[in-house]
Amino acid sequence: MSNGNDVRPFRLDTPDEALADLRRRVEATRWPSRELVDDRSQGVQLATVQELARYWTSGYDWRACEAKLNALPQFTTSIDGVDIHFIHVRSKHEDALPLIMTHGWPGSVVELLGSVGPLTDPTAHGGAAEDAFHLVLPSLPGYGFSAEPTELGWNSNRIAQAWAQLMDRLGYPRYVAQGGDVGASVTDAMGRQAPEGLVGIHLTLLAGAIGIKDKLPANTEQERAAHGALETFMKDGFGYFLEQSTRPQTIGYSLLDSPVGLAAWMLDHDTDSYYKISRAFVDGEPVGRLTRDSVVDNITLYWLTGTGASSARWYWEAGRFLAAAAASGQAPPPVSVPVGFTAFPGEIWAAPRSWAETVYPGLAYFNEVEKGGHFAAWEEPELFATEVRAAFRPLRQS
């Protein structure tokens, strides 16, 4: 007899009918006219999406992604009434440090797959055995193969509590956490909750910058450039955020009915990653691991799981949580564990060290790297893994 704490093996087996339906829908797309500008200022460009659709129906193989996922140990377990899907790869090095790593939107566990080898088996990737991790990659509630919450309240704080339960259930009394995008918000919440066993966090996005932008330093050229990037995002890159934080259900109808509509919505996230992805499709010149196959893998996962609307609801929850916090006038509790932060140059706003120290006075590790963007682990998995190793190295037990 099963119980609520069971950890159950998971294997993906997509019905042929689902793939045939996807293909029919893509081929039946009703296309808009071309944008009237030569950049993305009106949105995702027609040439990019049409080339993506052509590849999706003529050159892409979902079964290859399915096999890649099924080659990894996957599981589900029920936490707080929601079935959570996760990948759990234990290193061959028994003294490895347990690490829970959280993806964001419009990402999934797909964006983290390239870092699995470097993090769990560093000796095969130019690293040392003492830098190994036991890796846990959960799918956020309402994302991918995790179930949709059926009640309100699944904001970053609640997800952080669920992740602490997951690590306890897996038998890890001491672990670290990492995240970017939505995952950065969840990991930040874990650091502020400081559950027993969590000894450090590492982030690639300074998610808290939006709420305190007027308090962030603007003295140096780098700081002023970061302010400029943040202002540009708030004025010209905020469309998806505003829609999903106010009307996720409304956009959800389109996201679950049109694969091409879903693809365009997911591509229209940030300028740096959009142009890199566009280059992969239009010019056939991918940047890092942002290849045509990996991009379509991620979009197809959203489509097959029907999670366009449910994933968007995290933003609605976040908006209400932040509004309530602002109305209360109470500052969030401090992060009481060591914090590591890596600034990737293509991030929506590449936070200077002074900004990271403002948000995290206990900053223990900071580095600026020369390449990579918002999807750091996806685009540059080896570099990303190097940063994660460096950030957590002082926290390992000898």
Give residue ranges: language-model regions:
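C-terminal subdomain of alpha/beta-hydrolase-fold enzymes, centered on the catalytic histidine
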Residues: Q244-S398
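Glycine-rich "HGGG/HGxG" loop immediately N-terminal to the catalytic nucleophile
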Residues: W62-A64, V110, G127, L140-W154, ...
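Short beta-strand element of the alpha/beta-hydrolase
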Residues: A96-G104
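The serine-hydrolase catalytic nucleophile loop
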Residues: W105-G117
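Conserved hydrolase catalytic core segment
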Residues: P118, P122-A124, Y172-T220
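Conserved acidic catalytic loop of the alpha/beta-hydrolase fold
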Residues: N157-Y175
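Conserved alpha/beta-hydrolase
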Residues: L119-F145
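Non-catalytic accessory segments flanking enzyme active sites
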Residues: P15-R90, D95, S294, W303-G306, ...
